[in-house]
Design a protein with these regions (language model features):
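Beta-rich, blade/repeat-based domains predominating
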Residues: 8-31, 38-41, 59-75, 102-115, ...
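A short loop-to-beta-strand structural motif that recurs across blades of beta-propeller domains
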Residues: 43-45, 85-87, 126-128
Length: 137
């Protein structure tokens, strides 16, 4: 049976998804205009899988979020497709820039044990791995 977790207005145009226990962590794009730009970018937030209740992880709009992975320490590594940013979002919502690239940083893979980011550069038609060890001391 299908389960609707939340109404469209609270979802902020979900893009990246990650299940953690009884929660769905959502990387939101923000409400797109006709050209996919946004007046208000999306947040990173958590939806309770039982109640559908939404809890913001980032208190401010974070970006046009795409890729989402756990950092293995209670936080997240996320990509902003439009801005070309790779961000770290700590468990408390603090956000910092890890890497800056050209537009097109899409879904990603992050391997916490080796601190390796595997990132598609969609508009450049390439995939590259990055060592983030220095970013997670």
């Amino acid at each position: 049976q299908d389960l609707a977790l939340a109404q469209e207005l609270v979802l902020e145009y979900p893009n990246g998804l990650l299940v953690e226990g009884d929660s769905l962590v959502v990387a939101a794009w923000g409400k797109p205009e006709a050209n996919f730009s946004t007046k208000v970018p999306g947040h990173l937030y958590r939806l309770n899988l039982t109640t559908g209740a939404k809890t913001l992880i980032t208190s401010k709009p974070t970006g046009n979020l795409d890729g989402l992975e756990s950092d293995g320490q209670g936080g997240y590594v996320v990509s902003d497709w439009v801005a070309g940013k790779i961000l770290h979002v700590a468990a408390n919502g603090d956000t910092r820039l890890l890497r800056q690239f050209k537009q097109g940083t899409a879904d990603l893979a992050y391997l916490p044990e080796s601190r390796t980011l595997i990132l598609p550069h969609m508009l450049e038609n390439r995939v590259q791995a990055y060592d983030l060890s220095a970013d997670f001391k």
